[in-house]
């Protein structure tokens, strides 16, 4: 009957049940069979039902194969090899789960022009995806519960002989799926729900972040001396009598940069001394291979996952005070206008005289504390030089956005007890200015010498992003002329005019940042738009960034030692592209991990704010709602379904969400109430303060409906409800 019905329906035309029966000449006695046929066709996605209850045959566009990516329990996407993505409704999963390879048919939506959807027809490959969940034990039976919402409608079956306890968080792999039942095999224990860090453990497991170093790396690092040995003093500039200092955060343990500043009659000498990691980490050693695999350190609220073993990162490579340390140094001679007169790169040895913190130096600049007179003089000279460098960069087109960020404060047990907005002081800006000049100087020298190198590059913003930035500013009543933006200086001049005529808040600064392209590593130099630098590399943090370590190696082997230069050039030319790609990739991964974990700990703190009113600013508008930012720089979501009482639509450019009566625009300040927190996902849900009471009524009705449905389902399972045919 299904084939008969389908043959006699015209595409994109709506038919009532009676019309279909009449067209197909179906006797009323067979209405139940027709109903079954129609519902089967609905399940297959071959027909759809409109709001009037009528049936519409849909156009088949093509057959596809791809990877099934489930977003939540209600929908998914199929991603194909040509990077196309097709929407799949829950009714059309047909047994597929996340990461399965599937075959599907793509249909044209009869409701929205140019909209398509897919229906899974066949599972091509069970890729045995991994799932993380927790164990509950009832009447001696172990039950596995997945954290991911997309799996909450499934029933799991796990081996009862596995060695796990109540609340253990475990990793399993899917063995098979039969009728919404997933059979899984135990892989390992990840954490426990009793830990304040279990959500963090889950993020690290999902990202396959390895904390511990392999045995061969630890064995190799154990052979490295924990002090500078006698032969290492040879052929180095001895700077141990100089007033060289470090300035870092309160919690910093890996000190990879130190400074010395001297003011002379007609110039400044800025000496930047960087930990000589390349002296200890040889190319292609076990430590080096692991460092490249990690490519960066990851900084979490409660710990650091280092790029190098602790013996190096916090030990022999760290420029700790009062001990001799090997350094890669650059002396930069700078005139009083901020121009670099000359530079000198060399290998040195230092003995840091002071381990200062940003807070200490800021207190000194604010006349809150006194220091050693010689140190005070150098710090004052340093501040003078920093301001000169800052003005120089400003003239070149650098925009110092000073975007406010928040830091999670944990107690001894690891629970979030506060969120602090970080304010940058003079000392933080000073170190940044000095490091930028050092990075520019090294990049310029490598380029001038025509040597293979690794650059930190940042392309010009696209015309599309500049146009969107202009539109965004106009919604805020700010004029900005896109066609004139042809260089960092042009962008900077336009932004300065905005600052002179309007009050610039954190949101506008974030919009500037969003307008920019992402900075990456490359063996090809195109300059750095954001820093207004023609040449820029990362030289100053080899303990925590692999590109810096690689750059040190290039300098040692091609600038300091010119033997076999042709062979060295060929060698590095072959590997630098891969090193750049790996470093860029791992940086993105690290930023994502840091953001996820910070969001989790922030959400944990916001549990105590449920039901409270907060001031917020709209920072992003998407098809499903709008993100807002609170005064402590934490984000929350107002889902479009929680914009109550009116029918809201999002503008195509994402600058506005509006109904017939109300408009909300990017940058607008609003009052909201926190209504829900998901610590596992690091999400905070809010509603407009004016909608709060209506939201509570809606939520109560929904919970009552769920409870009633659960009771009915239970009774149905127990045979207490008899449905008439």
Curated annotation (Swiss-Prot):
Gene Ontology cellular-component terms for this entry are:
cytosol
Task: Please write the reaction equations for the catalytic activity of this protein.
Answer: Exonucleolytic cleavage in the 3'- to 5'-direction to yield nucleoside 5'-phosphates
Keywords (A to Z) from UniProt: Cytoplasm, Exonuclease, Hydrolase, Nuclease, RNA-binding
Top-level EC class as recorded in UniProt = hydrolase
- At the top level, the lineage of the source is Bacteria
NCBIfam families (alphabetical): 3_prime_RNase, RNase_R
What family does the Swiss-Prot or TrEMBL record give for this protein? Belongs to the RNR ribonuclease family. RNase R subfamily.
> What this chain does, per the record?
3'-5' exoribonuclease that releases 5'-nucleoside monophosphates and is involved in maturation of structured RNAs.
Q: What is this protein called?
A: Ribonuclease R
């Amino acid at each position: 009957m299904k084939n008969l019905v389908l043959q006699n329906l015209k595409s994109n035309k709506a038919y009532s049940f009676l019309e279909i029966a009449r067209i197909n000449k179906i006797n009323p006695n067979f209405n139940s069979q027709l109903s079954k046929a129609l519902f089967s066709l609905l399940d297959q996605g071959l027909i759809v039902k409109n709001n009037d209850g009528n049936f519409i045959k849909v156009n088949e566009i093509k057959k596809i194969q791809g990877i099934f990516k489930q977003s939540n329990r209600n929908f998914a996407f199929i991603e194909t090899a040509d990077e196309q993505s097709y929407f799949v409704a829950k009714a059309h999963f047909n047994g597929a789960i996340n990461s399965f390879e599937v075959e599907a048919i793509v249909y044209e939506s009869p409701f929205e022009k140019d909209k398509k959807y897919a229906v899974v027809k066949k599972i091509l490959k069970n890729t045995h995806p991994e799932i993380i969940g927790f164990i509950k034990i009832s009447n001696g039976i172990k039950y596995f519960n997945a954290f991911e919402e997309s799996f909450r409608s499934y029933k799991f079956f796990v081996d009862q002989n596995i060695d796990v306890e109540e609340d253990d968080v475990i990793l399993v792999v899917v063995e098979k799926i039969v009728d919404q039942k997933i059979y899984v095999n135990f892989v390992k224990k990840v954490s426990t729900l009793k830990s304040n860090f279990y959500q963090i453990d889950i993020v690290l497991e999902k990202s396959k972040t390895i904390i511990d170093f392999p045995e061969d790396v630890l064995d190799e690092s154990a052979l490295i001396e924990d002090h500078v040995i006698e032969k290492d003093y040879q052929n180095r500039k001895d700077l141990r009598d100089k007033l060289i200092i470090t300035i870092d955060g309160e919690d910093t343990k890996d000190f990879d940069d130190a400074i010395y500043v001297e003011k002379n009659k007609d110039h400044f000498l800025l000496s930047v001394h960087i930990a000589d990691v390349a002296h200890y980490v040889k190319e292609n050693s076990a430590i080096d291979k692991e460092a490249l695999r990690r490519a960066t350190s990851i900084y979490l609220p409660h710990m650091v996952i280092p790029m190098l073993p602790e013996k190096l990162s916090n030990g022999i490579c760290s420029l700790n005070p009062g001990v001799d340390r090997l350094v890669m140094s650059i002396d930069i001679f700078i005139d009083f206008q901020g121009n670099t007169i000359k530079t000198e790169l060399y290998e040195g040895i230092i003995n840091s005289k002071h381990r200062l913190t940003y807070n200490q130096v800021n207190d000194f600049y604010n006349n809150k504390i006194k220091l050693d007179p010689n140190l005070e003089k150098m710090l004052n000279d340093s501040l003078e030089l920093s301001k000169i460098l800052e003005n120089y960069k400003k003239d070149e087109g650098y925009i110092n956005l000073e975007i406010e960020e928040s830091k999670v404060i944990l107690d001894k047990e690891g629970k979030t007890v506060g969120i602090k907005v970080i304010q940058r002081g003079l000392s933080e800006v000073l170190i940044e200015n000095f490091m930028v000049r050092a990075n520019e100087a090294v990049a310029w020298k490598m380029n001038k010498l025509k040597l293979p190198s690794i650059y930190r590059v940042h392309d010009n913003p696209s015309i599309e992003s500049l146009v969107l930035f202009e539109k965004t500013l106009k919604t805020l009543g700010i004029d900005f002329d896109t066609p004139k933006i042809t260089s960092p200086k042009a962008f900077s001049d336009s932004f300065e005019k905005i600052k002179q005529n309007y009050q610039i808040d954190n949101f506008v600064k974030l919009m500037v940042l969003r307008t920019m392209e992402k900075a990456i590593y490359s063996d090809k130099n195109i300059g750095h738009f954001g820093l207004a630098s023609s040449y820029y590399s990362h030289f100053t943090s080899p303990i925590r960034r692999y590109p810096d370590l690689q750059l040190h190696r290039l300098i040692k082997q091609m600038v300091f030692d010119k033997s076999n230069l042709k062979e060295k050039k060929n060698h590095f030319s072959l590997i630098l592209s891969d090193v750049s790609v790996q470093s860029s990739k791992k940086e993105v991964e690290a930023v994502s991990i840091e953001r996820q974990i910070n969001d989790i700990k922030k959400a944990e703190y916001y549990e105590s704010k449920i039901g409270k009113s907060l001031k917020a600013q709209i920072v992003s508008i998407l098809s499903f709602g709008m993100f807002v930012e609170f005064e402590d720089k934490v984000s929350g979501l107002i889902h479009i379904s929680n914009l109550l009482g009116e029918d809201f639509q999002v503008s195509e450019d994402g600058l506005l969400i509006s109904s017939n009566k109300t408009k909300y625009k990017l940058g607008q300040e609003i009052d909201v109430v926190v209504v829900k927190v998901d610590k596992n996902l690091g999400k905070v849900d809010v509603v407009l303060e004016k909608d709060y009471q209506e939201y509570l009524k809606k939520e109560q009705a929904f919970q009552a409906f769920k409870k009633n449905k659960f009771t009915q389902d239970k009774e149905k399972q127990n045979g207490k409800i008899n449905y008439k045919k």
